[in-house]
Design a protein with these regions (language model features):
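Glycine-rich anion-binding surface patch
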Residues: 1-134
Length: 134
């Protein structure tokens, strides 16, 4: 797991996004663990305690980061026949670095939008991740 590849922050998802968030948040003890099964190998981001780190899907982990980084989450607007409809897609706004702003593209969940915004605030539009995660 030594080869790294550049990935657009806007395209990060799953374990790749979780690892990038862990690095952006300064969780220096986080590590990428291969899980080998007879049919395939997959990866998890873990704390030294063995806790799986999944800020892009776990509100208990991602929620505090939204507060820490002051990420604004906005549902995608829909104007239906009966007025505004509930949206299943979200985007995030984040301000960083003395007033710079980043707005994500629409994402399937609020946590994914927030996590992408946090990664962008720390690393920019691209981030290096292990090639195995692509």
């Amino acid at each position: 797991m030594s080869e790294m590849t550049e990935v657009k922050t806007a395209e990060l998802e799953g374990v790749a996004l979780d690892l990038a968030v862990a690095l952006a948040a300064g969780w220096v003890s986080a590590r990428l663990i291969p899980i080998i099964t007879p049919s395939k190998t997959y990866y998890e981001v873990q704390a030294p305690s063995g806790l799986q780190l999944r800020p892009s899907t776990d509100w208990a982990q991602g929620g505090p980061l939204i507060v820490k980084y002051q990420v604004a989450l906005v549902p995608e607007a829909h104007n239906g026949l009966q007025g505004t409809e509930m949206s299943e897609r979200w985007y995030a706004d984040i301000y960083y670095g003395g007033g710079q702003q980043y707005t994500t593209e629409h994402c399937n969940t609020a946590l994914v939008a927030a996590c992408r915004a946090i990664v962008c605030a720390e690393f920019g539009d691209t981030v290096s991740i292990p090639a195995e995660l692509i």
